[in-house]
Amino acid sequence: PPADVAAAGFKSIICFSGNREGMSEEEGIKNCAKGLKQIVPIAYKHGVKIVMELLNSKVNHEDYMCDNSIWGVKLCDAVGADEFKLLYDIYHMQIMEGDVIATIRKNQDYYSHYHTGGVPGRHEIDKTQELYYPAIMEAIVETGYTGYVAQEFIPAGPDPLTSLKQGVHICDV
């Protein structure tokens, strides 16, 4: 519950849309917005933001509803509350839609958190994958974002701590 999240000192909680299960995008937005409109005021009362994660439905989360930026933005507009935002997972959105930097710039007001991960494979964000994270981080900084960027990858190297340190270094712009 939001009260527990606030008591623990956290300012946001991540939520998920669930799967399509045959629903149209419009019906999914309507259903999610209906539920979120009940939750968001409670979270707001406790100073907590609700953040829905954008995930890919091609590789990792088959049938997931909130699998593209446009759908997420429409949901934010339907909820109509500053206390509800999106988590832009760079790994997932590269798989689903590409055009990462332009999408971040275009929808910056809807994003309140970011996750990293190398594509393909969700490994380190180094030269072994297709994204150039220094440019992505510069774009995020240019939007005025001052929050955290979470390193959310599965280390392929022998030392996970070294991989994490490298990821932090790559993102330190």
Residue ranges, per PLM feature:
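Histidine-acidic metal/acid-base catalytic patches
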Residues: K49, C66-Y88, H92-V173
